């Protein structure tokens, strides 16, 4: 492989030298009389060409010594490996993302179900509390009405008793004022005769 590259490089250098020599030969044929120093120019050109060929040969040797192709191959291999790792990491990340997205969707669904259950239970609890409050209010109202009715009955009984007491007192006062001693004896006698007749 190295020998083939060296032969190729040497062939390129020889072709460049040949083309340069051909160019100078043509120029010398066309206007050789005008240039007295064409031999000196040719010698200068040859040294420059040799310098260039040596420079190319040294560059090729240095590149081979540095193993640029191997370095580039290693670099390419490293880049391919890194790229494969990046692709694998991307696929793993996409898989994880899909998994987490699925979990998040599932969690959202569960949250919605829990929220709906809590809302439904809250509504049922609200209805139960309202029903209990209505029952308690009805019981309190019934108790209040019963207490009020009892109080009214008690008040009526007390009023009747008081009215009867007052009526007796008033009647007694009127009787005491209006009845004379003879009337009293007459009434007692009538009462006694009624009692005797009944028995």
UniProtKB/Swiss-Prot annotation:
Main localization category: membrane
A molecular-function term among this protein's GO annotations: proton-transporting ATP synthase activity, rotational mechanism
Transmembrane segments: 5-25
GO cellular component: plasma membrane; proton-transporting ATP synthase complex
Keyword terms, alphabetized: ATP synthesis, Cell inner membrane, Cell membrane, CF(0), Hydrogen ion transport, Ion transport, Membrane, Transmembrane, Transmembrane helix, Transport
InterPro entries: ATP_synth_b/b'su_bac/chlpt
Subcellular compartments: Cell inner membrane
Membrane topology designation: Single-pass membrane protein
Pfam families: ATP-synt_B
Function noted in UniProt: F(1)F(0) ATP synthase produces ATP from ADP in the presence of a proton or sodium gradient. F-type ATPases consist of two structural domains, F(1) containing the extramembraneous catalytic core and F(0) containing the membrane proton channel, linked together by a central stalk and a peripheral stalk. During catalysis, ATP synthesis in the catalytic domain of F(1) is coupled via a rotary mechanism of the central stalk subunits to proton translocation.
Oligomeric form and interacting partners: F-type ATPases have 2 components, F(1) - the catalytic core - and F(0) - the membrane proton channel. F(1) has five subunits: alpha(3), beta(3), gamma(1), delta(1), epsilon(1). F(0) has three main subunits: a(1), b(2) and c(10-14). The alpha and beta chains form an alternating ring which encloses part of the gamma chain. F(1) is attached to F(0) by a central stalk formed by the gamma and epsilon chains, while a peripheral stalk is formed by the delta and b chains.
Similarity annotation: Belongs to the ATPase B chain family.
Descriptive protein name: ATP synthase subunit b
Gene designation per UniProt: atpF
